[in-house]
Structures are given as C-alpha cells and as structure tokens.
C-alpha cells in the first residue's frame, strides 16, 4: 500500500505520514519530522496567496488568519 499524504497543511507544509493521526492534531506538521512542501492544491493556493504572513493557517483548503 503506497504512502498516503495527509491533506492537513500548516504554513504551506503537509504531513506525509502513514498510520499516524497528524491530520487530526497536526503534530508532524508542527515538529517538522515529516513535512514537505505542500502539494495539495487548496493548501498551495493558501500558502502562496496568504496575505497574513506568518499568521496564515491552512487546513484542508481553509485559509484563516
């Protein structure tokens, strides 16, 4: 079974974890142990188009400040 990339996104990074709850708690996005540049289209849009600087929080296509 191939690795499944989570759709959760923090500051333009996504968690690429299998069998972990990073999508729920965002832990591996925060500690950076398995983060990569976000490939999720909605998150890319958020990360690239956020006008809130470091205040941008991207989760599953939502881009709140």
Curated annotation (Swiss-Prot):
Keywords: Metal-binding, Metal-thiolate cluster. One of its GO terms (molecular function) is metal ion binding. Induction: By heavy metals. Pfam families: Metallothio_6. It comes from the Eukaryota. The keyword Metal-binding applies. The keyword Metal-binding applies. InterPro entries: Metalthion_4_echinoid/annelid (IPR017980), Metalthion_4_echinoidea (IPR001396), Metalthion_dom_sf (IPR017854). Metallothioneins have a high content of cysteine residues that bind various heavy metals. Belongs to the metallothionein superfamily. Type 4 family. This is Metallothionein-B. It comes from Strongylocentrotus purpuratus. The lineage of its organism: Eukaryota, Metazoa, Echinodermata, Eleutherozoa, Echinozoa.
